[in-house]
């Protein structure tokens, strides 16, 4: 079975941390995901300090000629989720480096036609079935999307209307894949950061615990903003 939860938090908190530490909003998101997973590992009595985890991040792919408008066309790359770093500020800096390295690797892979989507296009169906069988045998030790799938998508800044009806919130989710038990997807919309969590309920029976951990990680970074922004709440409201 699956557990699914979603809720909103102020996007200004992400902007304040981004501005205060000189990183991107996506870096803040990745760092908070890493801190959340660290808390979960500790709850499950694993050694969270042992090593980093691996996150799978989907990206929009370049459609071949004639494929315009035909469903989704995406690829994926991987980044380190530094759950092994206890200090939130150090983890944020490491997440910034991890995200930058992933972007460079993805660009080179796409240019060489060697990204995951391109490779799967040339794999025969029987080989993909064998890969899935092998991944399932590993019981979470290996997965197409690493240890967790995560996605941060910038959404509309202005309200969207369907006829005269205003869209109040924007929630979206990805999938959980073979070998990966949790997906954390965040959309921004009209000043809100909308976080959706989909998980294998055998591994994570309470999705709200994951959401609460994420909020705590974000609030911790806000509280640790540099001294030039003495009042975290003032820094958030001024952004």
Where are these regions (language model features)?
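Helical lid/core segments from catalytic subdomains that handle acyl or acyl-like groups
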Residues: 2-6, 67-156
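Gly/Ser/Thr-rich phosphate-binding loops and adjoining beta-strand/alpha-helix segments
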Residues: 1-60
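Soluble, non-transmembrane catalytic domains of enzymes that act on hydrophobic metabolites at membranes
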Residues: 24-28, 36-45, 78, 86, ...
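Flexible, Gly/Pro-enriched loop and linker segments at secondary-structure and domain junctions
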Residues: 1-7, 143-185
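A generic structural motif
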Residues: 13, 21-22, 63-65, 80-86, ...
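Short strand-loop-helix active-site module centered on a catalytic nucleophile
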Residues: 28-29, 33, 95, 150, ...
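Extended, hydrophobic beta-loop-alpha segments that form or line the acyl/peptidyl-thioester binding
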Residues: 178-233
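Small-residue-rich loop/turn and linker elements
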Residues: 45-69, 230-238
